[in-house]
């Protein structure tokens, strides 16, 4: 049997709409991600378990893990009979790359089970394709960091899908999921079809400056440039209490904050553990809306999807 864990990810990071994403892991050792197991069988079977298994489609063929198996078999040109188990630890529609976790874990597990017939580039292309079935368009800002780890910049030129951007070891990512769902498709539909010239210029300046600051090792500058003129001004209205939360975490001392992916999870960057804890405490009390919500203090997950058993 092969068992693969794929970590949560925070896409966009305010400054890089659809082109930046970071894999994250809680500092307390909690597994924030999905696990998929694969073993040989006489015919295909899929079993779901985990905290959020009851949120999955009841029809197996609608489950993205089934679709991963089906597409992987197509890529190899043969049917591979396996029993798969999805441990769904990630809330759906959370802005933490829930579907990317399932896709990355399923495809890496299948590839390992079959002796690695597909290279990383081919696997990543399949992940983007399958993620696109859920979000409505192919984009890699969750699957790339989830699969490869670290902070990833989407390139999509010269046969290169993404490349890693150096992160900062001192950064702590406070992630607060309020317990409500935001559809990626709905969050994309709310965005304008066209943008003002000054917003396009500001976006380019912020993103170029952020990448420069990462490579020139200027964490304060990098954090200061994490501004969103593309999505947040429009998506904030979908997130109850988001604007107040951003103001509060800034006053506590967060270096930057914004919407993780398409929301509703909020991320806040801190460079001191005590600041991160105060931010986490405030968000736990004021941003969470029900028992399904949670707050985690995280660091970059540099390993990405990996075999755990």
From Swiss-Prot:
Task: List the InterPro entries.
Answer: GHMP_kinase_C_dom (IPR013750), GHMP_kinase_C_sf (IPR036554), GHMP_kinase_N_dom (IPR006204), GHMP_knse_ATP-bd_CS (IPR006203), Homoserine_kinase (IPR000870), Ribosomal_Su5_D2-typ_SF (IPR020568), Ribsml_uS5_D2-typ_fold_subgr (IPR014721)
Q: Name one Pfam family in it.
A: GHMP_kinases_C
One GO CC term of this entry?
Answer: cytoplasm
MF terms from GO for this chain are: ATP binding; homoserine kinase activity
Q: What class of enzyme is it?
A: transferase
Q: Does the keyword Nucleotide-binding apply?
A: yes
Gene3D superfamilies, per this entry? 3.30.230.10, GHMP kinase, C-terminal domain
Instruction: Cite the entry's keywords alphabetically.
Output: Amino-acid biosynthesis, ATP-binding, Cytoplasm, Kinase, Nucleotide-binding, Threonine biosynthesis, Transferase
Reactions catalysed: L-homoserine + ATP = O-phospho-L-homoserine + ADP + H(+)
Q: Where in the cell is it found?
A: Cytoplasm
Q: Does the keyword Transmembrane apply?
A: no
What EC number(s) would the UniProt record show?
2.7.1.39
Q: What does the record list as GO biological process? A: threonine biosynthetic process
Q: What does this protein do?
A: Catalyzes the ATP-dependent phosphorylation of L-homoserine to L-homoserine phosphate.
The record's comment on protein family reads: Belongs to the GHMP kinase family. Homoserine kinase subfamily.
Q: Which HAMAP family match?
A: Homoser_kinase (MF_00384)
What protein is this chain from?
A: Homoserine kinase
Q: Which organism is it from?
A: Salmonella paratyphi B (strain ATCC BAA-1250 / SPB7)
The gene from which this protein is expressed is thrB
């Amino acid at each position: 049997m092969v068992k693969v864990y794929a970590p949560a990810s925070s896409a966009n990071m305010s400054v890089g709409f659809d082109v930046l994403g970071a894999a994250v892991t809680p500092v307390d050792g909690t597994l924030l991600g999905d696990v998929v197991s694969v073993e040989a069988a006489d015919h295909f079977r899929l079993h779901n378990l985990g905290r959020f298994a009851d949120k999955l489609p009841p029809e197996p063929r609608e489950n993205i893990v089934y679709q991963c198996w089906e597409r992987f078999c197509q890529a190899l040109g043969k049917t591979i009979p396996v029993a798969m188990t999805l441990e769904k630890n990630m809330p759906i529609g959370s802005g933490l790359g829930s579907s990317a976790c399932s896709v990355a874990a399923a495809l890496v597990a299948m590839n390992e089970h079959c002796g690695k017939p597909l290279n990383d580039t081919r696997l990543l292309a399949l992940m983007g394709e399958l993620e696109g079935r859920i979000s409505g368009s192919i984009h890699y800002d969750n699957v790339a960091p989830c699969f490869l780890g670290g902070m990833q910049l989407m390139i999509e030129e010269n046969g290169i899908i993404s490349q890693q951007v150096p992160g900062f070891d001192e950064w702590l990512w406070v992630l607060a999921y309020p317990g409500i769902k935001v559809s990626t498709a709905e969050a994309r539909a709310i965005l304008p079809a066209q943008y003002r010239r000054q917003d396009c210029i500001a976006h380019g300046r912020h993103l170029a400056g952020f990448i420069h600051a990462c490579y020139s090792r200027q964490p304060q500058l990098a954090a200061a440039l994490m501004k969103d003129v593309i999505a947040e001004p429009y998506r904030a209205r979908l997130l109850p209490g988001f604007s107040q939360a951003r103001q509060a975490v800034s006053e506590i001392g967060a270096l930057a904050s914004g919407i993780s992916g398409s929301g509703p999870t909020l991320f806040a960057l801190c460079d001191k553990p005590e600041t991160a804890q105060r931010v986490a405490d405030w968000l736990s009390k004021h941003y969470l809306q029900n028992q399904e919500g949670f707050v985690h203090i995280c660091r970059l997950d540099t390993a990405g999807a990996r075999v755990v058993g």
